[in-house]
């Protein structure tokens, strides 16, 4: 097939005599035309190959750009998620800072309040009745204590009053046990020292006494059962 393609298309050329000047000129012209045609075909084939190569290269570049675009989108989503988490964390930290800014101060003031209460408790009742000045002083100290606790309460400090509640180790500290068969086990029966919390944090656990020997509370439904049947 290649030989047929490379032959001149004019069949009359086979009849030409190369020794004849006119035929030789015709053969030369035919050869020139054939070469020009082949060069044109070669250029067309080269242009087609180049165009195909450019298409392939363009397709490859598009594939690379699409991959880069996907990666950039993924990075952007990760950065956006990190920024949102940072925003929430910062907002939470700011809220905590506002809510718990007075934690140490409040704890110190509670110690002062305890000292005031202990001082009041050491004064015998008959002494107060016998000395009006001492009674006035005692009332003034008690008012100061109440004002201090009210000020702390306005800033989010809450008093824990757990008497009659189930013992909670997160908010209570058991100091002793009281045998009482009529109350469920681990019921707070006495508060030795009041506890305080700020927000959901404990400033100071309540020191309490708890019951022992009564019915236990079922963990599933809260029903009381006797200790003998437990």
Swiss-Prot record:
HAMAP family: GrpE
Biased composition (Polar residues): 221-230
Pfam families in the cross-refs: GrpE
One of the record's GO molecular function terms: protein-folding chaperone binding
UniProt-recorded name of the protein: Protein GrpE
Region (Disordered), start-end ranges: 1-28, 209-230
Species this chain originates from: Brucella ovis (strain ATCC 25840 / 63/290 / NCTC 10512)
PROSITE patterns named in the record: GRPE
Any single Gene Ontology cellular-component annotation: cytoplasm
């Amino acid at each position: 097939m290649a030989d047929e393609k490379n032959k001149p298309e004019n069949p009359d050329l086979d009849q030409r005599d190369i020794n004849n000047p006119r035929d030789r000129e015709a053969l030369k012209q035919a050869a020139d035309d054939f070469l020009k045609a082949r060069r044109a075909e070669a250029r067309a084939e080269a242009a087609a190959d180049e165009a195909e190569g450019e298409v392939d290269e363009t397709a490859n570049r598009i594939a690379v750009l699409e991959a880069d675009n996907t990666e950039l989108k993924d990075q952007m989503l990760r950065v956006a998620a990190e920024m949102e988490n940072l925003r929430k964390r910062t907002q939470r930290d700011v809220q905590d800072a506002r809510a718990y800014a007075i934690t140490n101060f409040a704890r110190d003031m509670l110690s002062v309040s305890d000292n005031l209460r202990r001082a009041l408790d050491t004064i015998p009742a008959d002494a107060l009745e016998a000395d009006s000045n001492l009674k006035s002083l005692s009332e003034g100290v008690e008012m100061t204590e109440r004002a201090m606790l009210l000020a702390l309460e306005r800033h989010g400090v809450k008093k824990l009053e757990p008497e009659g509640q189930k013992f909670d180790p997160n908010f209570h500290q058991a100091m002793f046990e009281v045998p009482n068969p009529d109350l469920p086990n681990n019921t707070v029966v006495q508060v030795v020292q009041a506890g305080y919390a700020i927000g959901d944090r404990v400033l100071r656990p309540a020191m309490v006494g708890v019951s022992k020997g009564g019915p236990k509370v079922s963990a599933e439904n809260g029903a009381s059962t006797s200790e003998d049947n437990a």
